[in-house]
């Protein structure tokens, strides 16, 4: 049975008041922002149940509330209302032109309730593309920092579909912006966290001569979504504490199990074959004291409102046999060791003490890339109807084995693993390995 979604209005939402820069001013991006691989679209759905608006007062439709709040937030976050422009060096020389043309906003209505589509839990009963904004006229999607669609359901619930360009903001920065929209939607006079541009504060070490562009082999990767129970996660945490005397996070456990399950499923012929894990660690706390870096403030994320890209790729390399044979606590240990190296590795990168650029990644089938969506602020965003029941990211690419750690829909607990990381030959074994974690 199909459920129709009808788009009822499309427009560019401009800042609702004058913004600081003069029209056409160009803002420089940081060396991390300008990593060519970040010039891509990040797509996600944010599902809000039919709970009554907080405060008890009758309110207009969610789409109208959010559209008005977006216009206010774009005054503070005016670069989101601009456009990316490339210099002579292509995407690697991009800047933001503060045109004030606005963010693309689409209003839509679904001819069903959220219950009719199982709360948009996995698997989706409405195609994701119906709930994400369609293309804006006259502008390339990769030049437009933000697109948003609000789809209202017959029950009063709604879905916010977001498409943003990673060049503007990392996950924490995007979450900070979305929470600012929520602050205005709930009637606040200003966002709880004031935005800071400060891209010049990010280290800019001399780049190595660029090598040839990476060869991107396309894989036939399959989607797998699985939930890890809170009980199983806590057991793994306890086992790690018993073995080491140290604590670990839910993220540590979830990626350890996912990496181990995938490695076992690959059945590499030699136990000495190398397998790789990569995740992206926030480095705002490592910027404290750097020139031009703003001091932390209450309610900030370690950078007093900095919303640009401020992360470092953390890599774990091990022999496949070691990953397969270890218990989950042992794999967690490998991950924790890599995390412990982060301050030193980031400091070396900042002063150009490296032989290979850590931001130039290699995409091979023996490499797994992991992203954590539980700590970005999206699960706390509130437009006046309470926080979302769950968030569904779509950060998948055919050349890149990916696992995203999220949260299952409330009231479920534990962790949700959303992956596109194995081909058909390895799919059954991967599913069985993931399932075995909860036995």
From Swiss-Prot:
Q: What class of enzyme is it?
A: transferase
GO MF assignments: hydroxycinnamoyltransferase activity
Q: Per the UniProt entry, what is one GO biological process? A: lignin biosynthetic process
Catalytic site positions = 166 (proton acceptor), 382 (proton acceptor)
Identify the EC number(s).
2.3.1.-
Under the heading InterPro entries, the entry gives: CAT-like_dom_sf, Plant_acyltransferase
Q: Which UniProt keywords apply?
A: Acyltransferase, Lignin biosynthesis, Transferase
Q: Which family does it belong to?
A: Belongs to the plant acyltransferase family.
Instruction: State the protein's purpose.
Output: Grass-specific monolignol p-coumaroyl transferase involved in the biosynthesis of acylated monolignols or monolignol conjugates that serve as monomer precursors of lignin. Can synthesize sinapyl p-coumarate, p-coumaryl p-coumarate, sinapyl caffeate and p-coumaryl caffeate in vitro.
Q: What is the name of this protein?
A: Acyl transferase 4
Give the organism, scientific name: Oryza sativa subsp. japonica
Organism placement in taxonomy: Eukaryota, Viridiplantae, Streptophyta, Embryophyta, Tracheophyta
